[in-house]
Amino acid sequence: SSILEMKWGIVPDMAGFALWRTTVRDDVLRELTYTAREFSAEEALTFGFATRVVEGAYGEAMALAREIAGRNPHAVRAAKRLANLAAEAGAPAILAAESAEQALLLRSSNQIEAVMANMQKRAPHFTD
């Protein structure tokens, strides 16, 4: 892995700095950006660029995707919005957004289906 933009005389874009600033230490991000040094998967994990390092990454990624796809799609979307907001907002805005998202989810047909499926020990059947 590497942050190659500097090699080509440009800077990272496509939200690179906006996303990395919350996951990668500033000194590490600066070094890797300024030098375009290649780094290993293990270093990517240590630096905060990767969640885990596994053999058979494609199979693991597909299993993770299936697991997420089996969750309430409205709750997954809400969690994505909250995670994105958490990277840039203060606690009051995040708390307000959590309450607003939860109010939309509670007692929705998909939330009820999630509860029922768990209680009945069966796979849920969500609508989108």
Where are these regions (language model features)?
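CoA-thioester-processing core
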Residues: 1-33, 46-47, 60, 64
